[in-house]
Curated annotation (Swiss-Prot):
Disulfide bonds: none annotated. One of its GO terms (molecular function) is translation elongation factor activity. This is Elongation factor 1-beta. Promotes the exchange of GDP for GTP in EF-1-alpha/GDP, thus allowing the regeneration of EF-1-alpha/GTP that could then be used to form the ternary complex EF-1-alpha/GTP/AAtRNA. InterPro entries: eEF-1beta-like_sf, EF1B_bsu/dsu_GNE, Transl_elong_EF1B/ribsomal_bS6, Transl_elong_EF1B_B_arc.
């Protein structure tokens, strides 16, 4: 099996949440992070878009979403794109 590239949109709980802490935690939990960008949503809220490469294994995406959703300050995380690498 190969690898899968994922684009994940991580929404903080509020504009006051420290995004740098969330980004640091993501990098700690997922060493194969390729890119992290911020995307303004509105009213001061900024989403974090993460490009991540993971092994192509069954149940992998659900595990990743659950791990990201468990980070303090994260309201929700969802995979918005995926492709085989």
């Amino acid at each position: 099996m190969g690898d899968v590239a994922l684009i994940i949109k991580v929404m903080p709980e509020s504009p006051e949440v420290n995004r740098e802490t969330i980004v640091a935690t993501i990098k700690e939990k997922f060493p194969r992070v390729q890119d992290i960008r911020e995307e303004p949503i509105g009213f001061g809220l900024v989403a974090i878009k993460v490009a991540l490469v993971v092994p192509d294994a069954e149940g992998q995406t659900e595990t990743i979403e659950a791990t990201l959703n468990a980070i303090d300050g994260v309201e929700r995380a969802e995979i918005v794109e995926s492709t085989l690498v």
